[in-house]
């Protein structure tokens, strides 16, 4: 039996639709259900940020999670497939009236994605102070906590509604199928068989 970690919400629903397309029947978590067993799979309904942790530590054989989370956590897992779900960007946001001037001293950047932000600015040889927040990132520039933010952008509406604009894109992100290294070698046939089936569905959707 393969254990599959899925992030709560839309990505889980869309992934389960792919399983339904492959195996038939209905794949759905009922109410507050955290574990579902069906067709020889055990599905775990976990927080988005926790999916790669479950996979890396072997509590799940495979999982589905955004590339931004994989990049931020820098974990030792195998990336198998871009599932083309939950497409978004990681971007820098600033106030509408501001312009980026990275030569200024003492620039503060607020974000949940500390590693992504630090690595990006290090590559640009820009010295910034990264302020870690856990939510409502858009608030930081409005109250003077930070000069800019690094955050997930899907439509850009949240930034616009808060008087911010996208200044630079850092990376594209979408949901990826990942695997635990030991599971991949120990259950290679099962995982690759499932991978091929999921890949066929993803490609058929264009």
From Swiss-Prot:
Gene Ontology CC terms, in alphabetical order: cytoplasm
InterPro entries the record matches: ATP_PRibTrfase_cat, ATP_PRibTrfase_CS, ATP_PRibTrfase_HisG, ATP_PRibTrfase_HisG_short
Assembly notes: Heteromultimer composed of HisG and HisZ subunits.
Annotated localization: Cytoplasm
Free-text domain note: Lacks the C-terminal regulatory region which is replaced by HisZ.
EC number: 2.4.2.17
Protein's job: Catalyzes the condensation of ATP and 5-phosphoribose 1-diphosphate to form N'-(5'-phosphoribosyl)-ATP (PR-ATP). Has a crucial role in the pathway because the rate of histidine biosynthesis seems to be controlled primarily by regulation of HisG enzymatic activity.
Gene3D superfamilies given in the database record: Periplasmic binding protein-like II
Pathway in which the depicted protein is active: Amino-acid biosynthesis; L-histidine biosynthesis; L-histidine from 5-phospho-alpha-D-ribose 1-diphosphate: step 1/9
One GO-annotated biological process of the protein: L-histidine biosynthetic process
Gene this protein is translated from: hisG
GO molecular function annotations of the record: ATP binding; ATP phosphoribosyltransferase activity
Protein name: ATP phosphoribosyltransferase
Catalytic reaction(s) noted: 1-(5-phospho-beta-D-ribosyl)-ATP + diphosphate = 5-phospho-alpha-D-ribose 1-diphosphate + ATP
Keyword Amino-acid biosynthesis on entry: yes
Keywords: Amino-acid biosynthesis, ATP-binding, Cytoplasm, Glycosyltransferase, Histidine biosynthesis, Nucleotide-binding, Transferase
Record bears the keyword ATP-binding: yes
Family: Belongs to the ATP phosphoribosyltransferase family. Short subfamily.
């Amino acid at each position: 039996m393969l254990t599959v970690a899925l992030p709560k919400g839309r990505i889980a629903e869309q992934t389960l639709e792919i399983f339904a397309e492959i195996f038939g029947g209905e794949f759905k978590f009922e109410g507050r259900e955290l574990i579902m067993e069906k067709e020889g799979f055990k599905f775990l309904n976990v927080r988005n940020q926790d999916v790669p942790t479950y996979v890396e530590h072997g509590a799940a054989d495979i999982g589905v999670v955004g590339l931004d989370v994989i990049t931020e956590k820098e974990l030792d897992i195998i990336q198998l497939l871009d599932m083309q779900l939950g497409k978004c960007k990681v971007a820098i946001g600033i106030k509408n009236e501001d312009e980026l001037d990275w030569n200024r001293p003492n620039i503060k950047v607020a974000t949940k994605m500390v590693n992504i932000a630090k690595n990006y600015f290090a590559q640009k040889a820009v010295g910034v102070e990264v302020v870690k927040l856990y939510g409502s990132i858009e608030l930081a520039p409005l109250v003077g906590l930070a000069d800019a933010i690094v955050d997930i952008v899907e439509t850009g509406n949240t930034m616009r509604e808060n008087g911010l604009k996208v200044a630079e894109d850092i990376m594209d992100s979408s949901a990826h199928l990942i695997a635990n290294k030991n599971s991949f070698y120990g259950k290679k046939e099962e995982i690759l068989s499932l991978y091929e089936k999921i890949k066929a569905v993803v490609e058929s959707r264009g």
